UniProtKB/Swiss-Prot annotation:
Species per Swiss-Prot/TrEMBL record: Homo sapiens (Human)
EC category name: hydrolase
Matches recorded under InterPro entries: PA_domain (IPR003137), Peptidase_A22B_SPP (IPR007369), Preselin/SPP (IPR006639)
Superkingdom, taxonomy of origin: Eukaryota
Name of the protein in its database record: Signal peptide peptidase-like 2C
Topology relative to the membrane: Multi-pass membrane protein
């Protein structure tokens, strides 16, 4: 908590702080009835642009894109250099095409013609232009003689500008570099969405585990009443059906290897064949998001008291209610709508984030890692995958950029102009050059949510099994939030994309292990054998009340049995001079272990009872929920004792019957007092 209290103020300071622009700027183009802003790229080491539009000069735009602008080439502007009295570029901003000479050479030619600014149009991407500087071809040539701003403009933006310059309209342009924030407010939105998704998915997984254990306990505890058997059978069948529908998929170590292999393969295929395989990811996202949206909304729809539509009994959809059919149709319509308008930057990101969150919740709910060993191996394998594709791959790419960043943002030379949908994306909320340039959105991959979310879900399931009041779940969720804050800080300090799993997996895994070690449950937490301490359903809100009712019923039954036993024992103990008795208290271990034959049953070994006179108890019935017969009712069934010559035969026969009687373990109750005979009974 102390670390969290330190990181939150620091993160807030980073939110409100700004830094001077680096290489991105804005070209504000204005005509008589039209204006628009365009992204420009410049070198902040050699050029200083005004910080706001009010201080930027608004100059006429000169179109020089049809003539070469390099020394030695046949250019009419070079001839004009010989006549200083004629300067057609005087007090204008020239726009020329990128040639074979350096930016400095072009800027020097434009400055010689009287231009006050130069826009160089280029077809290459930002990554390829990042190596282009204003350094002259001759290193010994100084840059002091270049005083005008020189910036690069995209070719598509040049075409858009020229489309508005038809006729005699005068077009003016102003270049400036607004301050860029270190971190935008949209990162706070992404933080809330990510932490909320992880917490909701983990809690949903724990709630499902609690309901599953509750149904299992209900199926194991059955009564002997004949009129309840049909109802119990129907309830067991319905619970079994719900259990089969809600049962999660256990993740094995073999699946970990398959997932890592497929992830590496898909990453490389997207890097080399992005325009083809991006549609594969769009299809996978559409299918998974549709199923996830249906899975999240179906519990709410099922709670509505809507009448089922009467369909033919032999129909394929006869068992599916009408509300669920309508919900499935709605989910399919939403997916089709998103596919059609997925590239609308103004509002489509809201729909994509909604579908993405439902997809993540569905995965966290349906996929279960049964042990911490499997969970740790899965998280560490994907951690190595993330670190490799972010920190190692830049040494092998031509542009020096990581494969992960190029695939996540999409190659600039992509002809499809598609973006991967497997991310949470929020547009920048502060106006800056980055809003117009290649980074209008801040993104967070689904892997940075789902992979640590598996551990959060495991912690909540473990809380259910050991009744720890969600200690593991809360600690792991807070650790995820702290790890995400550290990820944002590392991204700001290093000015590059970060392998978020490096911080998220470390924080969540170490925190969970520390909590288990402090509670001395490390072995149980590692193996996932929390059911050994199951005493209730900690994550299910409705389970506590049901547990209290069951405990009250057991206490009432035990007290009734104890009173009946006391009365029966009093009848047997009519002659205190001949018999010496002692009170035996059955321990909890003896009561719950059917194989441990307690010595307290010796007092009942002389009873010769007919098994046909006892109620029939099903073999599968739970001993805890078995209807108990007071011991006072058993006393009249005992026959008179035979002469001493027949006592041995009767005693042996009673012991033979004792092993097969279903009531042999009825007295083995926690805290149940039974009288133990210390002498043989005298003959009558």
């Amino acid at each position: 908590m102390a670390c969290l209290g330190f990181l939150l103020p620091v993160g807030f300071l980073l939110l409100i702080s700004t830094v001077a622009g680096g290489k991105y700027g804005v070209a504000h183009v204005v005509s008589e009835n039209w204006s628009k802003d365009y992204c420009i790229l410049f070198s902040s080491d050699y050029i200083t642009l005004p910080r706001d539009l009010h201080h930027a000069p608004l100059l006429p735009l000169y179109d020089g894109t049809k003539a070469p602008w390099c020394p030695g080439e046949d250019s009419p502007h070079q001839a004009q250099l010989r006549s200083p009295s004629q300067r057609p570029l005087r007090q204008t901003t020239a726009m020329v095409m990128r040639g074979n000479c350096s930016f400095h050479t072009k800027g020097w030619l434009a400055q010689g013609q009287g231009a006050h600014g130069l826009l160089i149009v280029s077809r290459v991407s930002d990554q390829q232009c990042s190596d282009t500087t204003l350094a002259p071809q001759d290193p010994r040539q100084p840059l002091a003689d270049l005083t005008i701003p020189v910036a690069m403009l995209h070719y598509a933006d040049m075409l858009d500008i020229l489309s508005h310059t038809r006729g005699e309209a005068v077009v003016r342009v102003a270049m400036y570099a607004p301050p860029e924030p270190i971190i935008d407010y949209n990162m706070l939105v992404i933080f809330i969405l990510a932490v909320g998704t992880v917490a909701a998915g983990g809690y949903w997984a724990g709630l499902t585990e609690a309901n599953r254990l509750q149904r299992r306990r209900a199926r194991r505890g059955g009564g002997s009443g004949g009129h309840h058997q049909l109802q119990e059978a129907a309830a067991a069948e319905g619970a079994q059906k719900e259990d089969n529908e809600d049962i999660p998929v256990d993740f094995t170590p073999a699946m970990t290897g398959v997932v890592v292999t497929l992830s590496c393969s898909l990453m490389l295929l997207l890097y080399f064949f992005y325009d083809h395989f991006v549609y594969v990811t769009i299809g996978i996202f559409g299918l998974g998001a549709g199923i996830g949206l249906y899975s999240c909304l179906s519990p709410l729809v099922c709670r509505l008291s809507l009448r089922q539509y009467q369909r033919p009994p032999h129909s394929l959809w006869a068992s599916l209610p009408l509300p669920l059919l309508l919900l499935a149709s709605l989910c399919a319509t939403v997916i089709i709508f998103w596919v059609a308008y997925r590239n609308e930057d103004r509002w489509a990101w809201l729909l994509q984030d909604t579908l993405g969150i439902s997809y993540c919740l569905f995965v966290l709910h349906r996929v279960r890692l049964p042990t911490l060993k499997n969970c740790s191996s899965f998280l560490l394998a994907l951690l190595a995958f993330d670190v490799f594709f972010v920190f190692v791959t830049p040494f092998f790419t031509k542009t020096g950029e990581s494969i992960m960043a190029q695939v996540a943002l999409g190659p600039a030379e992509s002809s499809s102009h598609e973006r991967l949908p497997m991310v949470l994306k929020v547009p920048r909320l502060r106006v800056s050059a980055l809003t117009l340039c290649s980074q209008p959105f801040s993104i967070l991959g689904f892997g940075d949510i789902v992979v640590p979310g598996f551990l959060v879900a495991y912690c909540c399931r473990f809380d259910v099994q050991v009744c720890s009041r969600q200690i593991y779940f809360v600690a792991c969720t807070v650790a995820y939030a702290v790890g995400l804050l550290v990820t944002f800080m590392a991204m700001v300090l290093m000015q590059m994309g970060q392998p978020a799993l490096l911080y998220l997996v470390s924080s969540t895994l170490l925190t969970s292990l520390a909590v288990a070690a402090c509670r001395q449950e490390l072995s149980l937490f590692w193996t996932g054998q929390g059911r050994a301490k199951m005493c209730g359903l900690g994550c299910a809100p409705s389970a506590g009340s049901r547990q209290k009712q069951e405990g009250a019923a057991d206490a009432h039954t035990a007290s009734t049995l104890e009173r009946g036993t006391s009365r029966g024992a009093g009848d047997l103990d009519s002659n205190p001079g001949e018999d010496t008795t002692e009170i035996v208290t059955i321990s909890e271990n003896e009561a719950t272990n059917p194989e441990d034959r307690s010595d307290s049953s010796e007092g009942w070994s002389d009873a010769h009872l007919d098994p046909n006179e006892l109620p029939f108890i099903p073999p599968g019935a739970s001993e805890e929920l078995m209807p108990l017969m007071p011991m006072a009712m058993l006393i009249p069934l005992m026959p008179l004792m035979p002469p001493p010559s027949e006592l041995g035969h009767v005693h042996a026969q009673a012991q033979a019957h004792e092993t097969g009687l279903p009531w042999a373990g009825l007295h083995k109750r926690k805290g149940l007092k039974v009288r133990k005979s210390m002498s043989t009974q005298a003959p009558l």
